[in-house]
């Protein structure tokens, strides 16, 4: 069985990226992503000949997230694979053209849901006109939630990494899911 794993970016390697690398190794799967740090991945003992970039994207937010979203939204691998595992929040739009699929959820997009107020108040800068950036952020969040829920309709099965994430998926996205601990 040919399996592809989608992940937002593989240039900063953390827990989610490590899980994806292990999944790819154990399932003999390919990884599709945007930015890749092959040196970091090889230093961790993983091969990189099965990791493919669908295009470089900016390194700073929110341009990084937006670019990753649209790269995956337009990705159509046709019948090249028998199954697709989507293992990134901004890569979830890859479900639109790639089926059958499963979304392995590390978390719904936190800046849209559970951390929205914190980010708005503590991270979004208040420069130029008072609170203008906060209003722009609010419009962006509204638009992103709309697209996120549209794309979610193309996800066929949801598996979460924890009971906590399962609760967030139910609360914010209204979908049931299973749990497979990494």
Residue spans of the language-model regions?
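Active-site donor-binding segments of glycosyltransferases and PAPS-dependent sulfotransferases
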Residues: 30-92
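N-terminal subdomain of nucleotide-sugar transferases
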Residues: 1-44, 79
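Membrane-proximal helix-turn-helix segments that form the acceptor-binding/catalytic region
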Residues: 120-158, 166
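Active-site regions of enzymes building and remodeling cell-envelope glycoconjugates
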Residues: 29-30, 43-55, 96-107, 175-178
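Helix-loop-beta element that forms the nucleotide-linked donor phosphate-binding surface
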Residues: 160-161, 166-182
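Active-site proximal beta-strand in glycosyltransferases
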Residues: 83-85, 96-129, 159, 178
């Amino acid at each position: 069985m040919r399996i592809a794993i989608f992940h937002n970016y593989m240039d900063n390697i953390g827990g989610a990226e490590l899980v994806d690398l292990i999944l790819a190794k154990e399932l003999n799967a390919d990884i599709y992503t945007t930015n890749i740090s092959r040196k970091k991945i090889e230093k961790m003992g993983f091969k990189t000949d099965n990791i493919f970039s669908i295009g470089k994207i900016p390194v700073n937010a929110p341009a990084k997230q937006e670019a990753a979203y649209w790269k995956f939204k337009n990705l159509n691998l046709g019948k090249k694979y028998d199954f697709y595992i989507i293992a990134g929040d901004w890569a979830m739009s890859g479900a639109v053209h790639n089926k059958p699929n499963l979304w392995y959820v590390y978390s719904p997009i936190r800046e849209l849901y559970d951390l929205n107020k914190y980010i708005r108040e503590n991270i979004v800068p208040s420069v130029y006109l008072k609170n203008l950036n906060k209003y722009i952020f609010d419009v962006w969040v509204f638009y992103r939630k709309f697209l996120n829920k549209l794309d979610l309709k193309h996800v066929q099965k949801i598996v979460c990494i924890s009971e906590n994430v399962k609760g967030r998926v139910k609360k914010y996205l209204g979908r049931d899911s299973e749990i497979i601990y990494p």
